[in-house]
Swiss-Prot record:
InterPro entries: G6P_Isomerase, G6P_Isomerase_C, Phosphoglucose_isomerase_CS, SIS_dom_sf, SIS_PGI_1, SIS_PGI_2
Pfam families, per the entry: PGI
Keyword Cytoplasm carried by entry: yes
Keywords from the UniProt entry: Cytoplasm, Gluconeogenesis, Glycolysis, Isomerase
Record bears the keyword Cytoplasm: yes
Family as reported in the entry's similarity comment: Belongs to the GPI family.
Xref: HAMAP family: G6P_isomerase
GO terms for cellular component: cytosol
Compartments reported by the entry: Cytoplasm
Gene3D superfamilies: 1.10.1390.10, Glucose-6-phosphate isomerase like protein, domain 1
Lineage per the UniProt record: Bacteria, Pseudomonadati, Pseudomonadota, Gammaproteobacteria, Alteromonadales
Organism whose genome encodes this protein: Shewanella baltica (strain OS223)
EC code(s) of this entry: 5.3.1.9
Protein name: Glucose-6-phosphate isomerase
Length: 545
């Protein structure tokens, strides 16, 4: 057993998990449960009353956090200490949304001035493009932005841009390309005019395979459509640390935006990686996005554990994963603009906490990162919600909804909200056999049939959920929401004593993929790998099965 699972608090939680009453009983015996188990911060309200948790549960979870030195670990992250120990890096995505008055030291120097300088550079660039001052090679203004990246440099900008669609500049359209599948970029290029298209290449090394391949294809298309190599600088900019490679490509050094080692890809949307977002919604709104995240940073850093929204959410998820064998969490967004958030949170959580050894290399003997999945309501109610209600797996759910819609049409939003709240209630209380039987009392079924159908209509309830509300989806509330999930992920990793900021599983896939690519291009069939890999590579080389 590890030190964590040997601890008295862990053992107490394990014993306690077997004695928590059904949530029906918890609500029946405490009419003030919502008031006791809800919290507002940074424009968000968290209702966590529909959880399998009592005051004793929370006390034990907070004790687990304290015993795991969570508060000290939070301070260490904000202070710029080397908490990504395997890569010997600080973790300071929070510095990207700091205020100009702050001082944050990384590797012996204050990084805030450079962050502010980059934001100011972004401001000038955004102004140039959106005002029409930036011209393409034929003198026309830019109408289309193509953001080329992969992982965090793709998913963050795409999902945030999608979420903030009501704030878009109507004169601009943005397209996102990530997959190395040629179909992805080909379908985008079919829509574009090279004279009015601007490409943003986002890669720290300017050598990420998928991103570089897509960028080279974009340049070939641009040149084939009439542009010259000398015109590339008017249509390509980069977010990278490798200035030399970017300038060799044809990008003007003045149009290269920095990346830093202390920002991981899945936390990078707050940096110049967010340039597509800034172009679409303007720098004032982009700064509001940063401000909302900064407010959540301040809350996370300063609120006591018992009143700390990311801490509470992280602990509850850990509670189900480690003591109820919950293998996944579902994120359900009751707002069409937020439909991409489950995929974003999936990358954030699973790439961060999909680890199996502690910081000192000891194999864990407890579950770590759960599978994160989900979708938008009410679509999911006609699909996978069935499994949530009557399936055998326990799947904690997060419901996310703005109280006000950007598109208030008739009763649409009232119906959306009623479905959202109704689902949380149904998951919590379920339906007993007697209730199901009573509903069938006036049906034409026989007594035997009623008994049978009633059994099929039983729902156990006691299925946990959180509900997150905001007044309206704005850049600020979205920033706070994303930062909330970033810190929730940190909380769990800190207690599990794992490194939430490396991704060696991703790196292995890259290495083996490059090796296979070499073998695909070889002059002879492959026979040096395992039988399956040899056969698959050789079938691909033949081009048919």
């Amino acid at each position: 057993m590890t030190l964590l699972t040997q601890s008295s608090t862990w053992q107490a939680l394990s014993a306690h998990s077997k004695n928590v009453p059904h949530m029906r009983e918890l609500f029946a015996t405490d009419t003030a449960r919502f008031n006791k188990m809800s919290l507002s911060a940074c424009g968000l309200l968290l209702d966590y009353s529909k959880n399998r948790a009592t005051a004793e549960t929370l006390d034990l979870l907070f004790a687990l956090a304290s015993n795991s030195q969570l508060e000290a670990k939070i301070k260490a992250m904000f202070a710029g200490e080397i908490i990504n120990t395997t890569e010997k890096r600080a973790v300071l995505h929070t510095a990207l949304r700091s205020t100009a008055e702050q001082s944050i030291i990384a590797e012996g120097q204050d990084i805030v001035p450079e962050v502010q300088q980059t934001l100011n550079k972004m401001q000038g660039f955004v102004s140039s493009v959106t005002s029409g001052q930036w011209k393409g090679y034929t003198g026309k203004a830019i109408t289309d932005i193509v953001s080329i990246g992969i992982g965090g440099s793709f998913l963050g900008p795409k999902i945030v841009s999608q979420a903030l669609r009501p704030y878009w500049n109507p004169e601009l359209k943005c397209h996102f390309v990530a997959n190395v599948d040629g179909t992805s970029i080909s379908e985008k290029l079919k829509l574009l005019d090279p004279e009015t298209t601007l490409f943003i290449m986002s890669s720290k090394s300017f050598g990420t395979q998928e991103t570089l391949t897509n960028t080279l294809t974009a340049r070939e298309w641009f040149l084939a459509k009439g542009g010259l190599q000398s015109d590339v600088a008017k249509h390509f900019v980069a977010v990278t640390s490798n200035v030399a490679k970017a300038t060799d490509f044809g990008i003007d050094a003045d149009n290269i935006f920095p990346m830093w080692d202390w920002v991981g890809g899945r936390y990078s949307l707050w940096s110049a990686i967010g340039l597509p977002i800034a172009l679409l919604i303007g720098m004032d709104n982009f700064r509001a996005l940063l401000s909302g995240a900064h407010q959540m940073d301040e809350h996370f850093a300063n609120a006591p554990l018992t009143e700390n929204m990311p801490v509470i959410m992280g602990l509850l998820s850990l509670w189900y994963g480690n003591f109820f064998n919950a293998q996944s969490n579902v994120v359900l967004t009751y707002d069409h603009y937020l439909r991409g958030l489950p995929a974003y949170f999936q990358q954030l959580d699973m790439e961060s906490n999909g680890k199996s050894v502690t910081l000192n290399g000891t194999a864990v003997d407890y579950s770590t990162g759960p599978v994160i999945w989900g979708g938008e309501g009410t679509n999911g109610q006609h699909a996978y919600h069935q499994l949530l209600h009557q399936g055998t797996a326990l799947i904690p759910a997060d419901f996310i909804m703005p109280l006000q819609s950007h598109n208030p049409i008739g009763e649409h939003h009232d119906q959306l909200a009623s479905n959202c709240f109704g689902q949380t209630q149904a998951l919590m209380q379920g339906r007993t056999f007697d209730e199901a039987l009573a509903e069938l009392a006036n049906s034409a079924l026989s007594a035997t049939e009623k008994q049978l159908i009633a059994k099929h209509k039983v729902m156990p309830g006691n299925k946990p959920s959180n509900t997150l509300l905001m007044d309206k989806l704005t850049p600020s509330t979205l920033g706070a929401l994303i930062a909330l999930y970033e810190h929730r992920t940190f909380v769990q990793g800190a207690i599990w004593d794992i490194n939430s900021f490396d991704q060696w599983g991703v790196e292995l896939g890259k290495d083996l993929g490059n090796d296979v690519l070499t073998r695909i291009g070889a002059s002879q069939d492959c026979d040096a790998l395992d039988a399956s890999s040899n056969a698959l590579i050789n079938l691909y080389r033949q081009g048919k099965i």
